[in-house]
Amino acid sequence: MKKITIAIDGFSSTGKSTLAKQLANHLGYIFVDSGAMYRAITYYALQNEYINQDLFNKEKLIKNLPQIKLEFQFNPKLGFAEMYLNDANVEKEIRTIKVSNYVSQVAAISQVRAKLVEQQQQMGKNKGIVMDGRDIGTVVFPTAELKIFMTASAQTRAQRRYDEMSSNSENVSYDEVLKNVQERDFIDTHREDSPLVKANDAIEIDNSHLSREEQFKIVLDLVNNI
């Protein structure tokens, strides 16, 4: 079967990465969680105190972008690739609510997006890739053979995220997670550079009431019909 590019976009906590992993594993494709890359840069900014509740030193972050090395390394025990920031595994650190609170602000910086889009396009130049994010079908791979746009209610997404974080023993309330989801929705859809929008040729899937297996079957059928 001819290898294709699959772009999965959508709002935060819609299960984009879960679906992308399922598809990549089934098809033998490369899986790239583009959000992990933005989270890693956000974590870097937090660690270097470029961003907090009171300030955001964008100039310093932009100046230091060349010093940031991002790569995915496959973990055979987990069955997927983990994010490495300057040769350190930060997969767990980038999934915290603290990083979630700032990632949309970091992702709105044009220089950050330019750096990561270039790296993402290099990853997918030979096709056979499933990548999820906010601008994959509109900016990174505008000619992708299959584009999916995932959505669900903010409350449903917040509950999923809360359950996930609670299972990882992170001390966070549902209301805090819901507020974060709603704030990220606003920033993601209103930023000047590559706002979150559905590509004209993307297929929208509202998975508010779909199981993981149901949505996987829907998308796999789409892949098989290309």
Swiss-Prot record:
The question of whether Nucleotide-binding is a record keyword is answered with yes
Keyword flag NAD: no
The EC number(s) given in the record are 2.7.4.25
Q: Which UniProt keywords apply?
A: ATP-binding, Cytoplasm, Kinase, Nucleotide-binding, Transferase
**Any single GO BP term:** pyrimidine nucleotide metabolic process
Catalysed reactions, semicolon-separated: CMP + ATP = CDP + ADP; dCMP + ATP = dCDP + ADP
GO CC field: cytosol
Residues that bind ATP, according to the entry?
Answer: 10-18
Q: Which GO terms describe its molecular function?
A: ATP binding; CMP kinase activity; dCMP kinase activity
Q: Where in the cell is it found?
A: Cytoplasm
Mind telling me which InterPro entries this protein's record contains? Answer: Cytidylate_kin, Cytidylate_kinase_dom, P-loop_NTPase
Q: Which family does it belong to?
A: Belongs to the cytidylate kinase family. Type 1 subfamily.
Q: What is this protein called?
A: Cytidylate kinase
